[in-house]
Swiss-Prot record:
Converts 2C-methyl-D-erythritol 2,4-cyclodiphosphate (ME-2,4cPP) into 1-hydroxy-2-methyl-2-(E)-butenyl 4-diphosphate. One of its GO terms (molecular function) is iron ion binding. Pathway: Isoprenoid biosynthesis; isopentenyl diphosphate biosynthesis via DXP pathway; isopentenyl diphosphate from 1-deoxy-D-xylulose 5-phosphate: step 5/6. PANTHER family: 4-HYDROXY-3-METHYLBUT-2-EN-1-YL DIPHOSPHATE SYNTHASE, 4-HYDROXY-3-METHYLBUT-2-EN-1-YL DIPHOSPHATE SYNTHASE (FERREDOXIN), CHLOROPLASTIC. The gene is ispG. This is 4-hydroxy-3-methylbut-2-en-1-yl diphosphate synthase (flavodoxin). The keyword Metal-binding applies. Binds 1 [4Fe-4S] cluster. Keywords: 4Fe-4S, Iron, Iron-sulfur, Isoprene biosynthesis, Metal-binding, Oxidoreductase.
Length: 385
């Protein structure tokens, strides 16, 4: 008897994700960072930090979007002078981002920031100031993030490796961490960012194998919204699926709140965050008998802000439509100018095409009310197809 052909599929169900890599635990203000805590989502303000009102307004918007920790730039003395007010009034922990001038590190610590990010590649004579920084941060009880970036790597390492290789990024980070450890300071988080997701992933893999510091994931200078989303999703997905990564920041040339939406969705897609509204929709084809794109967009807009985990399916034809709709909490299979509305796999009504969106939104709201009053809520999803 001929043996079956192997198709490379697992013989049994495989674990969705590897276990989280074990790390030391840190506190960034009220947010725990490390393997004992959920992966947190960060962003960075685009305002001038010395414009306190604008910065606090943007932090409020980020907080409303689900941001856990926010970073602010501190390139000038007037920015350093604003840190105390911002740190005090922010609803979420504030990290000061320091480049070039070491004196701003001490200003940020004195101002009450929850952590400080330092770039060892461009801070003047940084190695010689580590002892002072370690003492100041230790006395204040705040962590330091060593943020190595391919675009500002130490010239000595550029000369050694020729370019920003994974090995160069890792060596820079671990060298600086070692200096802090020599002075008795171990509340350290590390990032090794590169704009190439492949190099970035390899750098983090090497780093994860050589230390137990919590790791902040980021693809630096990822680009405009679409390109940056793809780069970050590819890199973060690879690492988080291996259990690597404790905080993330999706870097986009877009409003900061968009970074939070993308980052949160990445975590939800990996089941690292509870799912909320999920809309599943088909890509459409010649079989579609309705405008699936418009239908999906209108349903999404109508349910924006829904916090209940709900899966909604919007399907454009009878091939996959009924099956997908039955698998969702709520769905529609469209065709011939009408739509069959499914709830929990059962057809509850058929409505004219013009009433599909209105009906789906009404049913979603009704289901949401029921789920809010039900302590045994599962994790429903919305699928548009």
């Amino acid at each position: 008897m001929t043996s079956p052909v192997g198709l490379g599929m697992p013989e049994g169900p495989a674990a969705v994700l590897a276990p989280r890599r074990k790390t030391r635990q840190l506190q960034v203000g009220s947010v725990g960072v490390g393997s004992d805590f959920p992966v947190s989502v960060q962003s960075m303000c685009t305002t001038k930090t010395h414009d306190v009102n604008a910065t606090l307004q943007q932090i409020a918007e980020l907080t409303a979007s689900g941001c856990d920790i926010v970073r602010v730039a501190c390139p000038r003395q007037e920015d350093a002078d604003a840190l105390a007010t911002i740190a005090k009034k922010s609803q979420i922990p504030v990290i000061a981002d320091i480049h070039f001038q070491p004196r701003y590190i001490f200003a940020a610590i004195e101002a009450g920031c929850s952590a400080v990010r330092v770039n060892p590649g461009n801070i003047k004579e940084f190695d010689g100031r580590v002892k002072e920084v370690a003492k100041a941060a230790g006395d204040a009880g705040i962590p330091i993030r060593i943020g190595v970036n391919a675009g500002s790597l130490d010239p000595r390492l550029m000369q050694k490796y020729g370019k920003a290789t994974p090995e160069a990024l890792v060596e820079s980070a671990l060298w600086e961490a070692g200096l802090f450890e020599e002075h008795g300071f171990g509340d350290i988080k590390i990032s090794v960012k590169h704009n190439d997701p492949v190099i970035m992933v390899e750098a983090y893999r090497q780093l994860a194998a050589q230390c137990d510091y919590p790791l902040h994931l980021g693809v630096t200078e990822a680009g405009p919204a679409f390109q940056g989303t793809i780069k970050s999703a590819v890199a973060f997905g690879a690492l988080l699926a291996e259990g690597i990564g404790d905080t993330i920041r999706v870097s986009l040339s877009a409003p900061p709140a968009e970074e939070i939406k993308v980052g949160t969705q990445i975590l939800q897609s990996l089941n690292l965050r509870p799912r909320k509204l999920e809309i599943v929709s088909c890509p459409s084809c010649g079989r579609a008998q309705v405008d699936v794109y418009t239908l999906a967009d209108e349903v999404t807009a109508g349910l924006e802000g829904m916090e209940i985990p709900l899966r909604v399916a919007v399907m454009g034809c009878v091939v996959n439509g009924p099956g997908e709709a039955r698998e969702a909490d709520l769905g529609v299979a469209s065709g011939n100018g009408k739509g069959q509305i499914f709830v929990k796999g059962k057809v509850i009504k058929t409505v004219p095409e013009a009433q599909i969106v209105e009906t789906l939104i009404e049913e979603a709201m009704r289901i949401a009310e029921e789920m809010e009053g039900d302590s045994t809520t599962g994790s429903p999803v919305v699928t548009v197809s």
